[in-house]
Amino acid sequence: PTYYSAHTTLFPPAILQEGNYLKAYQPKLYVHPLAKITTIYDIAYNRVVEKQQGHGSCGLGFGATIARDRDEVYFYANDLQFPWVIQQRLQSIQNFYQSKIAQQPQAVQEYYADELQHYDEAYFIESCLNIKSFYEIAQLAQLADTYQHFIFEGSQGILLDTQHGFHPH
């Protein structure tokens, strides 16, 4: 099975797309309840920061999601069970980034707005709800006796880690 730990992030529309593609193989996906959820707001902000700094980024919002979580603006896998919680989390995250972007030059604000131009929040919420059939919430300790091997998601960027990897980070 594949496991997303509390130290990684997932983007529900991508999980939905991958789950639909792999459905015939009946993949087993387990997610820690505190795995962080990446939103389009995280992705847009990540791209804005990357455009300013030019450090190298995959542009998928990983760093922004982790930083947002450290700033105590949370959205976890466990929240995906409740539509009203998803909506509340998205509103909080949108407000969080709006306040950060409002302090930036006009060109940065425009770039952020452009990144969000085609965002469909209803589709994002629908993706959050529709991925339920592709995963189970579980802590690794609960699964250790059931499986001998796991594929841990989220380790692909280790060589871009600013302390352990290679330039560009």
Model-derived segments and spans:
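Non-transmembrane, aqueous-exposed alpha-helical and coiled segments at domain scale
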Residues: 1-169
